[in-house]
Amino acid sequence: MNRLAVEIPGLSLKNPIMPASGCFGFGQEYSKYYDLNELGAIMAKAVTPEPRLGNPTPRVAETASGMLNAIGLQNPGLEHVLAHELPFLEQFETPIIANVAGATEDDYVQVCARIGESKAVKAIELNISCPNVKHGGIAFGTDPEVAHRLTKAVKNVASVPVYVKLSPNVADIVSIAQAIEAAGADGLTMINTLLGMRIDLKTRKPIIANGTGGLSGPAIKPVAIRMIHQVRAVSNIPIIGMGGVQTVDDVLEFLIAGADAVAVGTMNFTDPFICPKLISELPKRMDALGISSLQDLKKERTNQ
């Protein structure tokens, strides 16, 4: 038995570690440095129906314990991704999780109906942190009813399991998670970035041209752990955890809190080899902590 194996809807993972969406592109650059078959899965860059240039620059800023970004979902659009990006990933055995974004419900439905055409795509990650342009720009993921409706609409057309990415910028993460689960979501990914800002002391203006950006990195890990623990306390829905993972101890902390697998984001920019390193280190750390397998760790968590 593979002691690192994880089975969740649509995904047979050889290990629980994967790069997070937006921090790995579509894998081509990283494939020059290591075998992508080492990874548990790959969360690909967000896809929208039409190409997007993203936000004006500067759109990235370092912080004391992480970074801010306001990339604006820059991507080449659905047709290009289906024709050029996903075919490259089909050579690997590693399952691909396609991140889908949009400005309207129709955008999401359009992409989700077709993204499964690639045999590499085994699941969808629904990015509901996007502003809903038909409802005053408020993010889809901040209202339980809107999140429920969008999830249901996507589930009606998707040919692969749907994991919904939760925004931490809400008053009650549990009510959002429960609404999404009730709509038929196969799993959750959490958390997305926290809204933040930095000021340039010389210009007296925000460093990010957009004003605000998403805070990621080690600074948000305690928030991610807390939110995963809260959702796990009321639901058995599969969870892919993310938010500030740097070390193998972070991976285990996420798993103990309630995640079934873990995605690594910002650290890919600091160390492109972070994912294979964590995969290599995980069994040794499990031995030191008396963890025989991830399956047993999950049973231990369930019985508490």
Curated annotation (Swiss-Prot):
Enzyme's top EC category: oxidoreductase
Residues that bind FMN: S21, K45, A46, N99, N127, K165, I191, G217, G243, G244, G265, T266
Binding site for substrate: K45, N69, A70, I71, G72, L73, N127, N192, T193
Keyword Chloroplast: no
Catalysis performed (reactions): (S)-dihydroorotate + NAD(+) = orotate + NADH + H(+)
Active site: C130
Compartment annotation: Cytoplasm
Keywords: Cytoplasm, Flavoprotein, FMN, NAD, Oxidoreductase, Pyrimidine biosynthesis
Enzyme Commission designation: 1.3.1.14
Keyword NAD among UniProt keywords: yes
Subunit organization: Heterotetramer of 2 PyrK and 2 PyrD type B subunits.
Cited function: Catalyzes the conversion of dihydroorotate to orotate with NAD(+) as electron acceptor.
Similarity comment text for this entry: Belongs to the dihydroorotate dehydrogenase family. Type 1 subfamily.
NCBIfam families for this protein: PRK07259.1, pyrD_sub1_fam
PANTHER family: DIHYDROOROTATE DEHYDROGENASE (FUMARATE), DIHYDROOROTATE DEHYDROGENASE (QUINONE), MITOCHONDRIAL-RELATED
Protein name: Dihydroorotate dehydrogenase B (NAD(+)), catalytic subunit
Source organism: Listeria monocytogenes serovar 1/2a (strain ATCC BAA-679 / EGD-e)
Lineage: Bacteria, Bacillati, Bacillota, Bacilli, Bacillales
